[in-house]
Amino acid sequence: MTEASARTIGPLPSRFSRDPKTPRSTDNAAAALLLAFTVLAILWANSPWAQSYSTFWDTHVAVSFGEYRAELSVKHLVNDGLMAFFFFIVGLEVKSEFVIGELTDRSRAAVPVVAAIAGLIVPAVIFLTFNPSGPDAQAWGVVISTDTAFLVGALAVIKPKFPARLRIFLLTLAVVDDVGALGAIALFYTDDLKLAPLAVAALLIAALAMVRRLPSLRGPAYAVLGFALWIALYLAHVHPTLAGVAVAVLIPVFTPERRQVEQTVDLVRAFRQSPNPQYARAVTRGLRESISINERLQTAVGPYVSFVVLPIFALANAGVHLDEQTITAAMSSTLTWGIVAGLVVGKFVGITAATALMSATGWGQLAPGLSLRRVAGGAALSGIGFTISLFIVDVAIEDPARQDEARVGVLIASVLAFTLSWALFRITDWISPPEPVGLTLVRPVDPERDHIRGDPDAPLVLVEYGDYECPFCGRATGAIDEVRTHFGDDLLYVWRHFPLERAHPRSFDAARASEGAAAQGKFFEMGRELFAHQDDLEWSDMYRYAVAIGLDIEQFDQDVRVHASKVLHRVRDDAQDAEVMDLNSTPTFFVNGKRHKGPWDAASLIRALEAGR
């Protein structure tokens, strides 16, 4: 299957809208770089040049404009300035997940969302049992966050079997975790508000909300207003990194629309035939605007955050001076052990218990192929709290010595969380190895129910899960005809519905129309019409196609509109089968009950079927 076809995703498009290998390797490299700079910071802070470490990061940088003057240390410039880009990327991901990603499907998202909330509350409660009062109690926010970059990288290092579903669960959990951590910063780690700059910030946020209506130059407008918002929040004594989140959540996100993509393709053809500046500008604009600015910014800014901002942040904040005095103080510090217990025990217990409760009560269900044992391993790994944890250490604790004790706690917790997760995955994979999902057809072919072409007793069976609005399914019809011609009576072909409504908004109605035609014995005839007119799938169009293939239009209307329950259940039953098998793109083929992996051109399908004789 091509990369483009993998983008045609339904309920959970963000999981599959990117190349499945590139982001994972990028995440791993980013986590490795973050770890390297963490080690470098520790070595630097404990080397003969340790004094230069603190001297450099404490160096002050000042900017003045008339009577206004802003002065920050290099460390605060990193934490307050550069880290705004980190929170900007987090905000973009959160917005994307809520609008077109994991969190759009409330039933699928319920378990990781509730687990994430428990993973925020339980660690804080455990920390406060160690530090119920005094200045250290203010550091409870250190234990609520999971470091997404380290989480993904550590999962790749541990290499549990079949990690795809677990990875999606943990990323969904991490999104909610980030929302909670950012909310904690806004609500509990901001004080001494200045109302005038805060009012200016509110006006800037309103202006940012209107930028989407501009016909052009939206990118520069977001940048200028975002920088102004950062300054306003800084002057208002609100943590200015929240400007990154505010800008991100106001940037629109959407899935590519097929019609707009096709219009851009037409412009490319026109440019090829007649290259000129006008067509070049139109093509550039069409390509740019067919993808949401949210996705474009994630792609453009994300690598700089992963490979520049976060390593610099680690270098600035992880330099714990591990002399005998610091280690001795940390080993006897309730602050240190409160952080360790909160992150390691709190995350593990909170996430695992909440998941078990949701599954047992039926309030939510785990995705196919994901068991409580797998979640437990991921929950342990969620105890790696680094980026935001170190960030809150600097915000919540004023005493440098206590900051070092807290950083030691974060480092110890990260090592213990990784070790615990590794042990859990190794033990559970050995005791009860997970099985891959979706490799076998979940429901056998039933000639009385399924839509079939060919002899029901044929030795070869090809099942397709498809979508009438999917252009790749439309192209596959020619391949299917070639395959059927090649095998003749030896092949039974079966069509099952898998309408990907989020990517193809008319696909479900098209499937209903085909079922209405099936009631009059013309299922495949209607399918031909639907594939031939994929850009015209309004109900008025489908009634025209019904007339064109000779249906009784009154009966068709009764079947699809008046007495629609049978039609609806039929389409949903097929779609639910696809969900159980964790299918994610169309077309998906099964050859003799086994999922076909790889290209689906006629030659490839013929080879796969021949191998099954």
Swiss-Prot record:
Q: What does this protein do?
A: Na(+)/H(+) antiporter that extrudes sodium in exchange for external protons.
Q: Which source organism?
A: Mycobacterium sp. (strain JLS)
Q: Which reaction does it catalyse?
A: Na(+)(in) + 2 H(+)(out) = Na(+)(out) + 2 H(+)(in)
Keywords, alphabetical: Antiport, Cell membrane, Ion transport, Membrane, Sodium, Sodium transport, Transmembrane, Transmembrane helix, Transport
Protein name per Swiss-Prot or TrEMBL: Na(+)/H(+) antiporter NhaA 1
Q: What is this entry's stated membrane topology?
A: Multi-pass membrane protein
The record's subcellular locations are: Cell membrane
Looking at the UniProt entry, the stretches that span the membrane are 29-49, 81-101, 110-130, 138-158, 168-188, 191-211, 231-251, 300-320, 337-357, 377-397, 408-428
